[in-house]
């Protein structure tokens, strides 16, 4: 099981985790590569025009991707607390898997913090040896485009949320 994770801080703090079985990864990577424009290294929704955003979101829905949206409210005092609460819920939700890999979109300012929290949460959940994690940059891992697109659409709301809705299987308020 592979879990790709990205966030958005637009409006609420959202962390989106798209879950994929290993056998689906090649086909999904081909879908992402097929969406790239000539010379484009990776997909990032905030950089795309609306027509492309619709195409990208619809392609992921059509591919059958499934994701959980973790939403941290304002009762958390700051962004780190919100991120921490989302990461803890993410680990709890996947602790029972016999083997899983979490790939987080790399934000250099958060890597050390994430690693400390993930060590703490995987130990507490008893899954330190079965739930692995790493940070990657978007251009190095094409499938980080999936949670990026879902997070962007969900945060925008309205017709964007409706469009991406079939890909969202759960919403967790933390």
Predicted regions and their residues:
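Phosphate-ester processing/binding pockets and catalytic centers
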Residues: 1-174
């Amino acid at each position: 099981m592979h879990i790709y994770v990205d966030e958005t801080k637009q409006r609420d703090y959202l962390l989106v985790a798209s879950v994929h079985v290993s056998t689906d990864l090649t086909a999904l990577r081909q879908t992402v590569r097929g969406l790239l424009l000539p010379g484009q290294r990776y997909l990032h929704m905030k950089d795309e025009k609306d027509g492309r955003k619709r195409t990208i979101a619809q392609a992921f829905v059509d591919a059958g991707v499934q994701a959980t949206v973790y939403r941290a409210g304002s009762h958390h005092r700051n962004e780190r607390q919100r991120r921490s609460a989302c990461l803890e819920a993410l680990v709890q939700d996947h602790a029972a898997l016999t083997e899983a890999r979490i790939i987080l979109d790399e934000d250099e300012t958060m890597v050390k913090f994430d690693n400390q929290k993930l060590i703490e949460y995987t130990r507490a959940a008893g899954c330190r040896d079965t739930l692995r994690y790493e940070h990657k940059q978007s251009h190095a891992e094409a499938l980080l485009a999936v949670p990026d697109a879902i997070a962007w659409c969900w945060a925008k709301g309205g017709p964007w949320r409706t469009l991406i809705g079939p890909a969202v299987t759960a919403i967790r308020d933390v």
